[in-house]
Amino acid sequence: MTLSERVGRVVTATAAGLVVAASVTVPAFAEGTINSHISNGRVGFETRSWWDDDSDGVSTSVSHYSKCNARSVSYELIHEYSWRPDAKLGTQALSCSRTGSRYWGRQVEDDYHVVIRGISGRASVSVNDFRIKY
């Protein structure tokens, strides 16, 4: 094998290695985030559901990244089951006068959603920057 053939093989092997290395995904610190808003949400309003893989140990939370137009909002985390009634995992209140977050801790692998259970100061609430992390 000539020198140019050896160099060609080394270059080809190096390029193939770089393609493989570039295709490897680095795991994220947060498994999932829902960035959304609430417009005139009333008591009983349900967020969309999400699947928590429980692969990262992150505490499930709701956050107001903007102030809202009521005094406070109470959110309840719901653990969804297909074969029995859903489980209520607790209610957390968030003030509307400032940004903030409330946490339910790490949850097991399954489907979840959040429900508005109370609104203080108004009949409905709007939050321009509402987030769920899981």
Residue map of PLM features:
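N-terminal prepro-regions of secreted/extracellular proteins
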Residues: 1-50
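Post-signal peptide N-terminal regions of Sec-secreted extracellular proteins
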Residues: 29-134
